[in-house]
Amino acid sequence: MKRNSINIHHVTSFSSSPFWCVFFLVLLCKTSTNALVKQPPNETTPAIIVFGDSIVDAGNNDDIMTTLARCNYPPYGIDFDGGIPTGRFCNGKVATDFIAGKFGIKPSIPAYRNPNLKPEDLLTGVTFASGGAGYVPFTTQLSTYLFIYKPLLFLKGGIALSQQLKLFEEYVEKMKKMVGEERTKLIIKNSLFMVICGSNDITNTYFGLPSVQQQYDVASFTTLMADNARSFAQKLHEYGARRIQVFGAPPVGCVPSQRTLAGGPTRNCVVRFNDATKLYNVKLAANLGSLSRTLGDKTIIYVDIYDSLLDIILDPRQYGFKVVDKGCCGTGLIEVALLCNNFAADVCPNRDEYVFWDSFHPTEKTYRIMATKYFERYV
């Protein structure tokens, strides 16, 4: 076990027998998720409220000039309504937009910090998510990193999860002024809270920084992530949320940029990245199951997206895809955010043939499929 000397957060020791700990956690994960996958029957959903990273950011970083984790410029948004870049890290809608549409709430979930946000949008939900965010505070401080030959160029991040909660508190006060305290409490209680985060912690912070690997092993770092995710879910519960879904991390070792950087000459999926992700997901599911039992509230749910996306990657033709190892933007090998722009990168003519839009984020079609899979299992 490597000792923790970096000032990120205290990490509880992991067992000296990794095999049996992982085996136990897998069993606990299966028990917890099987018991908690469904939302309560006959519940209406007035709003969807989202926290997390670039997977569900809809433009909260647009005016933050200290980060490159923003995409409010073409070709981002090329397939969104009107072909306008919104700040979504995608060619069109993201998964939470499709989920909101399927619930019949609204066609898409706007960014809370959108200057054109209408008061009525607050009643049906917003996203506080920010590109570059992570469960480990240090992740958001790093946020975006560009591999420009050598060395790495590190830049300040977006909105940390702790700050996203501050924005949520501001949102609640606005709601109270609009509809009163009692209705605000009812909306929060019945709304669906979705937390989608963790990819940046694994790729950018742990595997991107040798100094972090020297002070944490995979077991202790994933424990840190899962413990912080549990704390975040508990905070939402304290705010009055009673329908909370915390999403696991996707198979980050298979996204195009990570294949390019660590997948070897043949750009294979990076096994050690995916193994770390799976270990984190198991711990996250176990933590959420434990939290639900502690609170006596069975509406805190772990949502798996690892298998959903991996199934698409491993069997793309089943879903109508042709390209899984490159993004649609530019060469598809490394372009993301600033490197994916109309001046330096061409866009593939048929986005629906690509699983990934840029080198890190899926296409609108992929998100649509994953939203459908989500509904089949969790709603």
UniProtKB/Swiss-Prot annotation:
Gene3D superfamilies: SGNH hydrolase. Its main location: secreted. InterPro entries: GDSL (IPR001087), GDSL_lipolytic_enzyme (IPR050592), Lipase_GDSL_AS (IPR008265), SGNH_hydro_sf (IPR036514), SGNH_plant_lipase-like (IPR035669). The lineage of its organism: Eukaryota, Viridiplantae, Streptophyta, Embryophyta, Tracheophyta. One of its GO terms (biological process) is lipid catabolic process. Pfam families: Lipase_GDSL. GO terms for molecular function: lipase activity. Belongs to the 'GDSL' lipolytic enzyme family. The keyword Signal applies. The keyword Hydrolase applies. One of its GO terms (cellular component) is extracellular region. Keywords: Glycoprotein, Hydrolase, Lipid degradation, Lipid metabolism, Secreted, Signal. This is GDSL esterase/lipase EXL2. Transmembrane segments: none annotated. Glycans are attached at N42. Residues 1-35 form the signal peptide. It is found in: Secreted. Its EC number is 3.1.1.-. It is an enzyme of class 3 (hydrolase). The active site is at S54, D358, H361. It comes from the Eukaryota. The gene is EXL2.
